[in-house]
Design a protein with these regions (language model features):
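Buried hydrophobic residues that stabilize the cores of well-folded domains
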Residues: 1-170
Length: 170
């Protein structure tokens, strides 16, 4: 069950019946509906900054890596590069097909990047503003993603590194 307030979306996560897989997760939103931080059990894990409506920086807050962060570069609504504190980077390419699904296929898919900008977005019914690309992803660095499409341009199959997904629409 999700709990919604004016400035947050929360969920109680319960997996495997034991700690550390049981916790309360919350996305804190600004007045425009953008995620500004992600909390677990009331402790801030990540903070987000935006530029022109897109995530420009994600900072991880924990005792081991603080301040560890990722920066993001966007073009025409598509994430083109992410770079971390240690100058490691991932570059992305896209198909020429418009993204009709209104989801980010990179987030928590294929094990690419750092599991997406919003790594815990799987808790939520949709992606947040500033994380959905305009076109379908085609690659992350040298890991290519291939699609089969139906007559209306929706993907019916996605094949990527160690992945083969058949998509069904209801």
């Amino acid at each position: 069950p999700y709990t919604y307030t004016d400035n947050s979306v929360s969920v109680k996560y319960n997996d495997h019946g034991y700690d550390p897989w049981n916790y309360d997760a919350a996305f804190i939103l600004d007045h425009n509906g953008y995620v500004t931080e992600f909390d677990i059990n009331g402790e801030t894990r990540w903070r987000y900054e935006y530029e022109n409506g897109y995530v420009s920086k994600k900072q991880e807050n924990n005792s081991v890596t603080t301040p560890y962060f990722w920066t993001y570069r966007w073009e025409n609504g598509n994430l083109m590069e992410q770079r971390d504190s240690y100058s490691n980077s991932t570059t992305y390419t896209y198909t020429d097909k418009p993204n009709k699904l209104n989801i980010n296929l990179f987030d928590a898919q294929f094990g690419l990047g750092n599991f997406g900008i919003f790594a815990y977005v799987v808790f939520l019914p949709t992606n947040f503003k500033g994380s959905i690309p305009s076109n379908y992803p085609a690659s992350a660095d040298n890991s290519n993603i291939y699609y089969e499409y139906d007559d209306e341009g929706y993907p019916t199959q996605i094949v990527g590194p160690n992945a083969n997904y058949i998509l069904t629409y209801y």
